[in-house]
Amino acid sequence: MYKIIGKFYDEDIERECATPDYAIGVFMAQIQRGMQYTDNYTASDAIDEAIDVSRGVYTNDLPHFHQLTDDMWLELRKE
């Protein structure tokens, strides 16, 4: 089981995911959402992050922490 926790301004994020692929999808959706609020974050950054996350998932190099701003962050864990 994989778990994604995080903060999106006032919203707390917590999702459980059965497979790595689903976890990566949820993670990327939140990053893409964050891109709308962060001027200096690009699609290229999101792609690089997806590669890093997937590498972490498949090599069990977790937890993986990602922070867009002080108010937006995500962490992917294996439980």
Region locations from a protein language model:
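Intrinsic-disorder/low-complexity loop/linker signature
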Residues: 8-14, 63, 71
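Short, mixed-charge low-complexity intrinsically disordered segments
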Residues: 32-79
